[in-house]
Amino acid sequence: TKDLWKYNVKMKNKESNIINLGCRLNIYEGEVIKSLTKKNNINNYTIINSCAVTAEAEKKVCYEIRKSKKNFPFRKIILTGCAAQINPIKYEEMDEVHLVIGNNEKLDEKIWKNINQSNATIVDDIFKVSKTHRHLIEKFEGKARAYVEIQQGCNHRCTFCVIPFGRGNSRSVPINIIIERINLLVNNGYNEVVLTGVDITDYGNDLPNSPNLFQLIKRILNTIPKLKQLRLSSIDCGEINDDFWNLLSEKRLMPHFHLSL
């Protein structure tokens, strides 16, 4: 405990640390949060970017909250992510939690600029959100792969799945923004990029001319020849079409797919 106390003293006035739980989209968003906290000099917080896909995932959220407070008692804990969005009251009642922030709000720089003056829950109706944020991430610390958000939310209402209530309705990132994001990462030395979202096979339905995921992949591979490997996160097998099978001949598209069943 003496060593832990000394470590805590040394860590005071250090950058806030981010704990990402759950999906690859959270990894991407965690880097966005990290960049916003660094830019606005937000220090001495532990920010837990949570998951709520299963009951076990929610148990892990509570475990991480308590562990973080025990190990770094001087740091205020901010909870965000799907668990925070779906059940903010549950977590704001935990003594260890200083602030609860919703899934859309966590990507809003204005929220982080005023975070030191905030002490109340900041969670709005996620179903009112119709656009994606347009952040550019330069690197993913400690990771060989880079993650690029192409889509948010889900229009399906599967009886077993709570995620639409954490992420809202499906909304897509415009192709030019995706190309810009990938170009930046490739120019910074990343050989592999993972396209991520909540329901990426629904990509483009809300954009002008409704480009689909497979048209996006072709555009990326044709526009960015320096990109060596492109990988997909989870895909809905019900939305796979002939364009998808034709894409498998592309050597730079990794032939490993996680199917949501």
Stretches with model-predicted labels:
Residues 3-203, 257:
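Proteins enriched for Cys/Gly/acidic motifs involved in redox and nucleic-acid/cofactor modification
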Residues 77-81, 86-88, 187-261:
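Conserved SAM/AdoMet-binding glycine-rich loop
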